[in-house]
Amino acid sequence: MWGEIWKLNCPNGIKHFLWRMAHNSLALCCKLKRRGMDVDTSYFVCRRLDEDGGHLFLKCKYVKQVWCEMNLNETRERLASYGPAKEVAEHILRLDSEHQSNVLCLLNNWWCERNRIREGERKREGWEVAAITSRQADEIRNLQHKEHITSRGGGSRSGSASTRNSKD
C-alpha cells in the first residue's frame, strides 16, 4: 500500500497527507492526549465530540456538509464503516481516479480547514470548502490528462518551426 500512495498522480502534499493519515501520525487531539499532553480533546470546530480521525473527517456535521455538497455521501458512509485509518486509506486507493482525486482533495482540504480554524481564522461554509475542493480536484485531473497526452507524444513542441519567431 505504501508504494501505491507515492505512485498516485497528485501533488506530493496530498500524498504526504494520505501517508500520515494511514500511519495515524496526524496530530489529532485524542492522540496528543494519549501521548501525555494536557489538551482538550473536544473537536474545536463543532465542540460536540472528541477529535479523532473518524469524527474529524467523516462524522462531524460540518464535514458531512462538504461530502454532501460534492455528492460523495455514499463514499463517506462507506469510509466511515471501516475501522483503522489504514483500512480507510486502502479503500481510497481502490476508488476510480475521479472519486479518488475528489476524496483525497476533500480530506486534505478539510485537514487544512481544521488547522485554519485552530489558528483563529473563520470557519468557511461547507459549500465554500466543497467549491475549492472541486476546483482543485478538477485541476489535478486536467494536469493528469495533459501529462498523459504529452507522454504519448500528442503534445506540441514549443521549439517547432511553426511556433518559432523568426527575424526576416
Task: Indicate residue ranges for each PLM-predicted region.
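Primary recognition of RNase H-like, Mg2+-dependent phosphodiesterase/nuclease domains
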Residues: 1-168
